[in-house]
Amino acid sequence: MALRLGFIGIVTRDMSASLTFYRLLGAAVPERSDEPHVDTSLEDGTVLAWDTIDLIRRLDPGYESPSGGHRIALAFDQGTVNAVDATYARLTGAGYEGRTKPWDAPWGQRYATVLDPDGNSVDLFAALEN
């Protein structure tokens, strides 16, 4: 059987702020931000989920939030070079921190990085057009 990623979990300090960011990114996130667990399916079937720190600590009493740096790095294919630039502009224009402005990477992609409300790296990319 081929290995297939099916679930990505994000532990968040502020569910509402995190969901607002990912909605702006383009995820079809349900409107219920007062629950300790929220999830949505991406177009490829991968489940993207959020859990509050309180919920994680109830499930794992020994859980300690990581300190320093980001906890997870995510990369979302934007489809086109222009979409990378537009998504970066939309997110940074809404006040989210841009870590790396859009640039043409030597591996053949347009690439940019924005931080989500929990400080996680969210990369935006698309293949460079020939």
Segments (PLM) and residue ranges:
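Hydrophobic pocket/interface hotspot
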Residues: 18, 22, 84, 91
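Short, flexible coil/turn micro-motifs enriched in small/turn-prone residues
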Residues: 1-4, 103
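Core segments of cupin and vicinal oxygen chelate
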Residues: 2, 9-57
